[in-house]
Amino acid sequence: MALNVVILAAGKGTRMRSDLPKVLHPIAHKSMVQHVIDTAHKVGSDAIQLVYGYGADKLQASLGEQQLNWVLQAEQLGTGHAVAQASPHIADNDTVLILYGDVPLIQQSTLEALLAALPENGVAILTVNLADPMGYGRIVRTPCKGQEQGKVVGIIEQKDATAEQLLINEINTGIMAVPGKQLKIWLSRLSNNNAQGEYYLTDIIAMAHADGVAIDTAQPQSAIEVEGANNRVQLAQLERAYQAREAEKLMLAGANLRDPSRIDIRGDVTVGMDVMIDINVIFEGKVTLGNNVTIGAGAILIDCEIADNAEIKPYSIIEGAKLGVAASAGPFARLRPGAELKQDAHIGNFVEVKKAVIGVGSKAGHLAYLGDAVIGDGVNIGAGTITCNYDGANKHLTVIEDNVFVGSDTQLVAPVTISKGATLGAGSTITRDVGENELVITRVKQKHLTGWQRPVKIKK
């Protein structure tokens, strides 16, 4: 039996006040609908039907390369009508899981619990109990005694509910699992004879009860999982909830967060033990932190690997880079893609490294640019040093071998190799290879002019 996931994503989202389709608004730098798609994959979906409407070009530009079956809902006539558009792509023996593109925080474990609750040839719906259920469809059950729950007999929408039904605090989330054959039959029976004039997907629950089909329920661990975002205030609330959840995962994995409410996780972060993360740190993409790593305030880490005992000092940007054991960068350092710091290497403030390897114990303390370079072990790079790697058309490599000392304000015009043990005098411009243990100085000879007078300001 295949798992066929239907994701409803046709709404415009008028209250967002945006040209962007509602489901493309981001949580943690990823669109809401992408979160839902990713979770659908995690539960083992065999096919995903994406029901779309408004903003088709933008949706396809964002999601087009993925394995999705695009299903057009030309008119938005309700959730039942939306799912009905996907009917031709649903086999009788499919299990159909219905999700919503603007409910991004739904968890894999919750959907697995829902599918586990699915009776044979029956229906499983995801419900939640709210202290204030205003605006939501209510779960109607048969009367029962004591603490036992009655059987689900239907779902009544807020606008169609009686005064007694409005007292029910178990609400419908809209998420459900349904056998494909029965779903198609029930969808064909839907009517829009209701206060909204829409085809409610929820009406199939009453049909299932009338047909004698078993209906079971499951509930999420937290109600926030099933909340949607209809405006930017709600979007921000979901963002904070997502960040709180991700911060908790890091702490449980061994990270110490100086303030869990001041961290942004916009990707997948893996941490070792005794990691220290200061405030206002941003993680994007895939980031791995080893044991005893320290991340300073305001740092930004993007798609990088940080080994044990390494330190990222405040306000550094580390992107597509690797730091070895006990290496350090910052404060205010920038490591661009292809940068690699070996064990005990140090990159200091206002140093930029791009597509360069910095060897064991080597240091560039301040105010340097190191691009397209291979730097050996035990090298000292003086302040103001630049690898001149670009000739206006092509990039060229600078090689600095072990134990080289580069004086301040040195320009290395690539391609060039500085051999082991060489010393480059401050202010030099190096255009040719340097041999082992050589001292090279290219600056202009110093002149002393006696009797020279400094200009004075002319009084007007």
Swiss-Prot record:
Record key words, sorted: Acyltransferase, Cell shape, Cell wall biogenesis/degradation, Cytoplasm, Magnesium, Metal-binding, Multifunctional enzyme, Nucleotidyltransferase, Peptidoglycan synthesis, Repeat, Transferase
Record GO biological process: cell morphogenesis; cell wall organization; lipid A biosynthetic process; peptidoglycan biosynthetic process; regulation of cell shape; UDP-N-acetylglucosamine biosynthetic process
Chain positions recorded as acetyl-CoA binding sites: A383, N389, Y390, S408, A426, R443
InterPro entries, A to Z: Bifunctional_GlmU, GlmU-like, GlmU_C_LbH, Hexapep, MobA-like_NTP_Trfase, Nucleotide-diphossugar_trans, Trimer_LpxA-like_sf
GO cellular component: cytoplasm; membrane
Subcellular localization: Cytoplasm
Residue segments, region N-acetyltransferase: 254-460
One Pfam match: NTP_transf_3
Oligomer and partners: Homotrimer.
Protein name per its UniProtKB record: Bifunctional protein GlmU
